Amino acid sequence: NSSGEDDLILVLDVEASTSHSVARISDGEVFLRQNDKSVRLSREQILALEYDKGQRVFEDELAEDSSMEDIDHDVLDRYKEILGTNASDEQVLRSRRFMRNGKLTVAGALLFAQDPSAMLPQARVRVLRYDGVKMKTGEHLNITKERSFHGPLPKVIQDAYTLISSMLREFQFLGPDGKFQTVPEYPEFAWFEGLVNAVTHRDYAFRGDYVRVSMFDDRLEIVSPGALPNIVTIDNMRTTRYSRNPRIARTLSEFGWVRELNEGVQRIYTEMQNSLLNDPVYSEPGKVKVQLTLENNIVARTIRRSEALEDQASPEVISSLSEYELAAVRLAFANGKV
């Protein structure tokens, strides 16, 4: 130091609490430490904190104004077949903790109600296709296709899968054997697992937003409302198991949709690598949502296609074609037919 003496440095190592409970002071108030300040939380913020810590589980809350009349019996009948039971609808819902006191729980409504969005407006999936690589608004709005899906989660997942599959492109290139080979824009497992994870693990207590799938020319983005749950981080999500909505996750697993979160994420990486595409990118914009971005490498694929075309036609022939003739030849070459 300035006196020429050694400084004494104290290092305080405070381990994170293993308790998942929210501590209240004598008057019932709850404070949250943010940087160097203690901030008093509102009732809504306290509930959100309790959900995040797992002290309360939003999917187990009751969906007000719900009843057996809201049930989609086709979906519930499928579930009863999976369980191999002949019990009544109400018995099944009660025994699996999807109904209490004649009302559906949030999980019960999301999984089995005809229209969960009537009780939970945030419960929907929206799929959008954009022309280009950026989202534009106003007079430059570039949405070419848009559809929202409401209904019980098993139906939403199936219907969204069908639409997205129909909107994805295929790429063709000339293989080393001289034959055309077709590859999908993205490996199916990667985008579908991303969709299922978003629907399953999103924060349904987070109101005002919904699961969103945005398709651009060069990438596909899947946004799930709410930050990552509890102990999961961007860095450890490939190895950490945790479910914010365990009842929903278990039931969708019984329907054949859901894997363990870390197992599915790890395979998304593997599938993208096997398709010679960039690794998936996970991010938490504003710490209020989780975004998965899959890049389709369209530029490199276009270059490879052009190079393959040039291998089949001389530069003189290509240069002699008009702009429209060249576009027609490229289209026929890409599709493998005229």
Regions found by a protein language model. Give the residues of each.
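Glycine-rich/acidic phosphate-handling loop/turn and adjacent ATP-lid/helix
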Residues: 220-255, 299-321, 326
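Short, surface-exposed charged micro-motifs
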Residues: 11, 126, 210-212, 281-282
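A residue-level signal for conserved active-site and pocket-lining positions in enzyme catalytic cores
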Residues: 12, 110, 292
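Glycine-rich phosphate-binding loop
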Residues: 189, 241-274
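Divalent-cation
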Residues: 1-30
